Design a protein with these regions (language model features):
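An acidic-aromatic loop/edge-strand motif
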Residues: 390-410, 490, 501-538
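Aromatic-rich carbohydrate-recognition surfaces in CAZymes
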Residues: 1, 52-167, 184-202
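Extended ligand-binding clefts on enzyme/binding-domain cores
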Residues: 11-18, 23, 47-60, 65-72, ...
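Aromatic-lined, polymer-binding surfaces characteristic
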Residues: 16-36, 55, 93-94, 122-128, ...
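Terminal, non-catalytic domain-edge segments
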Residues: 316, 331-385
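Aromatic-lined ligand-binding clefts that engage carbohydrates, nucleic acids, or primary amines
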Residues: 423, 447, 455-481, 514
């Protein structure tokens, strides 16, 4: 077992110990440890099963208890690359990013509006996550030195939460599968605790004036939260929705970070209500559905710090893992009445099972004290490659046109001299509206589409021509009749794909023909292609 028998009894019992042992390896395995140019450890988690993002804030936030427990080097390993990106000139928004790219490429946010717009971002969610995690590291180390490396970003995000956090606008949170929700009470709790964490960081840095200011704001927000979210014997899902409820898992930081912003009666009232509404296999995420998130149940179970309450919420989760008929790695999203997996396989978020251990300062100190790496002096973020457009995509040229058909053409459709007089003409950006990251200018809603266009290639020399493609789903590309590239699955933004040797050899100065076939099976769909020259960063 992962812990000695005395610790198992102390921290939550045998069922909890078995849950922790089951989660431990999966959490670490669902990501990659690497060394930076200075030999310091970095960690990149993968958002398995959903969109495959790398270094996602609202994935490493729920997984963080396992990393925090085992010391500063682990906890900082996933924050350093994220914070370096947030501090770069690539990130221009007043809130924290969502992700670093699509695994395994950490080359910039792809979720929602990416680096371009605020569409479908998670501004309160991500900003709160980072302030809380910085607060947790400071709590562990007894100083705010690590937070000081990124102080301008943390100040900016605290200002954002001060303005937007108490009563969040209609936006997504980490539970984005449930859709947008305005006036989210649990998200508000995250923002309030995040502001408290920032106040504590200010105090550790000796800025007592700012610390007092933010503690005052956090306490006032908490007072209003208690009043405005109250729904009798529990607290609401949304401030404007009486008769609703939700798990308030974000409140754990009020006690772990010793902020003491909320009365203990809040947790007690919530817990009594939770025990009255949970099902055979666990406590639903909120009143809207009967599904739950395993990681959040394990956080919620800790709120009163009472062993009986903890075991009351953990036992149904243990029962689910024993009785579910789904034979897959530990899922974190399942139905609480049927024990059926809804989705999410082998994700790192199950590291959240270890939240219970962060309440015991002696145990946390014991395991964190085993950190022998003492990571420091991380290398600067690598300079990104420069990209020069050779033939534009729809993003650069909204008026560019392609010839296209949705009827299977003759077998030589990709040859340079193929007759496309019977094909249609449409503006670049083919797909269905609502597809993530897509700028649709010509609707395509069938299973397949074939595209062709001519382009002129200036005289070289060209050292590193690559395909720039946004595809949903599988695509194959030909240049002057030669196979140039294939791209499986889907992306939510443009990616650069190396050209095959045959495609490179077929390119010539002057007139060229590019031909594309894209196949769609389910969900959104989109295809757009261009060529770029990549110059390596220094």
């Amino acid at each position: 077992m992962l812990f000695r028998s005395s610790e198992r009894g102390q921290l939550g019992g045998e069922q909890y110990a078995e849950l922790a042992a089951l989660a431990y390896r999966q959490c670490f395995a669902a990501g990659k440890f690497v060394a930076d140019a200075n030999g310091q450890p970095l960690h990149f988690c993968k958002e398995n099963h959903s969109n495959g993002c790398i270094g996602t804030s609202d994935v490493f936030y729920p997984m963080s208890p396992q990393f925090l427990l085992f010391g500063p080097s682990l906890a900082k390993s996933f924050l350093v690359p994220f914070m370096n990106y947030a501090a770069s000139d690539r990130w221009k928004f007043p809130f924290a990013p969502h992700d670093l790219g699509t695994y395994p490429k950490a080359n910039g946010q792809v979720y929602g509006g990416g680096e371009r717009t605020e569409e479908n971002q998670m501004p309160v969610e991500e900003s709160g996550n980072l302030l809380l995690l910085m607060g947790a590291i400071a709590q562990m180390e007894g100083n705010a030195d690590f937070a000081g490396l990124y102080w301008p970003q943390l100040e900016k995000w605290a200002e954002y939460l001060k303005a937007k956090g108490l009563d969040p606008e209609n936006q997504l949170c980490t539970d984005d599968f449930a859709g947008h929700l305005a006036h989210n009470v649990n998200l508000s709790a995250k923002a309030i605790c995040g502001l408290g964490a920032f106040a504590k960081l200010c105090a550790m840095r000796g800025d007592n004036t700012k610390a007092e200011e933010y503690f005052r704001i956090a306490r006032e927000f908490a007072r209003r939260w208690v009043k405005e979210a109250d729904d009798g014997d529990h607290f609401r899902l949304a401030f404007d929705k009486p008769g609703t409820w939700s798990q308030k898992y974000n409140l754990i930081w009020d006690q772990i970070l010793e902020l003491n912003l909320f009365p203990i009666d809040v947790a007690r009232k919530e817990m009594e209500y939770y025990k009255s509404v949970q099902n055979r296999y666990g406590l639903p995420l909120d009143n809207r559905e009967t599904y739950t998130k395993l990681d959040w149940v394990l956080w919620t179970a800790t709120l009163t710090r009472q062993r009986a309450d903890f075991e009351a919420l953990v036992e149904p989760v243990f029962r689910f893992l024993n009785e579910t008929r789904d034979r897959s790695p530990m899922t974190d999203w399942y139905q609480t009445k049927t024990a059926k997996k809804v989705g999410f396989t082998a994700r790192p978020v199950v590291g959240g099972v270890f939240a219970q251990m962060l309440y015991d300062k002696a145990v946390w100190k014991k395991y964190a004290g085993r950190d022998k790496t003492k990571a420091a002096n991380w290398a600067p973020i690598p300079r990104p490659p420069a990209m020069r457009t050779v033939t534009a995509t729809a993003r650069e040229d909204a008026d560019m046109e392609w010839r296209y058909t949705t009827q299977r053409p003759a077998g030589d459709w990709f040859e340079p001299d193929f007759d496309t007089s019977g094909w249609n003409t449409g503006k670049a950006g083919f797909g269905t509206r609502g597809t993530p990251g897509a700028a649709v200018r010509t609707e395509w809603n069938t299973a397949d589409i074939w595209l062709r266009r001519e382009f002129k290639l200036p005289d070289g020399p060209w050292k590193n021509l690559q395909l720039r493609i946004h595809h949903d789903e599988d695509a194959e590309v030909f240049i002057n009749g030669a196979p140039a590239a294939t791209a499986a699955g889907y992306t939510t933004d443009y990616e650069e794909v190396p050209l095959d040797a045959a495609g490179l050899a077929a390119l010539k100065a002057g007139r060229n023909v590019i031909a594309v076939h894209c196949h769609q099976t389910v969900g959104g769909q989109y295809i757009d292609v261009g060529l770029v020259e990549i110059e390596s960063g220094k």
